[in-house]
């Protein structure tokens, strides 16, 4: 069976991922912007969920992947914190202004990881030359790449994903992700030859608030702040069944 990684934003979601049969989670905050580094408190509590490999995204903000020296220092410190909290792996990504892998910065982050596994996240999908980028990541010692094949979804990017799996030839893991569901996970794995897959498997959960102050927003006034996304244990289970 292929390895299933679930993107989780809470302890509740981590438990749902585990109970649904996923082997690993990528712990993130602010999934609405693609994920940023979660708090130390969330990491520590997620670490208590037994039966899961815990990877944590290291991303100081939303937006692009061009980072200054202050953001780099923050990422290094976050990685050291992850190490102290017993995290299994970190998920990193940084590009140069020209759209190449920032190998200098990434080497610093890999060094800070100090033996934890290192996944390069979907910053890969924003680089200008994916084949060169893959060789760069292999050279600096990344263990895995999360990618949609530089397409809107992993299914749409299956052609490039297959080429990347062949190019990697066992030197690095190619993990398809983006738009993965129980309806297409098996198809993506078959089309690409990948042995791991990444999914969000989320559902909307309504707020328990009884009093709701209409007309006041804590963020985007067009978003529903009385609903949040959590991992759907039934969808995780369905993905697992489809790829078993």
For every predicted segment, state its role.
Residues 1-25, 30-37:
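N-terminal pre-domain/capping segments
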Residues 2-8, 25-27, 54-58, 90-92, ...:
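Hydrophobic faces of well-ordered beta-strands that scaffold small-molecule active sites
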Residues 12, 31-52, 70-73, 94-114, ...:
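Active-site-adjacent beta->alpha loops and helix N-cap segments on the catalytic face
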Residues 17, 82, 109, 121, ...:
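Conserved, mostly hydrophobic/aromatic
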Residues 44-83:
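Structural motif corresponding to the early beta-alpha repeats
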């Amino acid at each position: 069976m292929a390895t299933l990684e679930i993107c989780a934003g809470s302890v509740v979601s981590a438990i749902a991922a585990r109970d649904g049969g996923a082997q690993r989670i990528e712990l993130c905050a602010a999934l609405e912007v693609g994920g940023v580094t979660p708090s130390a408190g969330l990491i520590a509590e997620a670490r208590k969920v037994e039966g899961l490999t815990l990877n944590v995204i290291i991303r100081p903000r939303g937006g692009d992947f061009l980072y200054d020296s202050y953001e780099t220092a923050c990422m290094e410190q976050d990685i050291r914190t992850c190490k102290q909290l017993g995290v299994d792996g970190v998920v990193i990504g940084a590009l140069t202004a020209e759209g190449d892998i920032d190998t200098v910065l990434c080497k610093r982050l890999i060094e800070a990881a100090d033996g934890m596994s290192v996944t390069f996240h979907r910053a890969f999908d924003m680089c200008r030359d994916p084949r060169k980028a893959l060789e760069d990541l292999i050279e600096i010692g990344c263990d895995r790449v999360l990618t949609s094949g530089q397409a809107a979804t992993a299914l749409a990017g299956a052609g490039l994903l297959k080429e990347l799996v062949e190019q990697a030839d066992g030197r690095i893991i190619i993990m398809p992700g983006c738009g993965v569901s129980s309806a297409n996970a098996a198809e993506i794995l078959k089309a690409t030859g990948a042995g791991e897959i990444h999914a969000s498997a989320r559902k909307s959960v309504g707020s328990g608030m009884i009093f709701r102050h209409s007309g006041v927003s804590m963020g985007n006034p067009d978003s529903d702040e009385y609903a949040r996304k959590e991992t759907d244990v039934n969808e995780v289970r369905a993905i697992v069944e489809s790829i078993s």
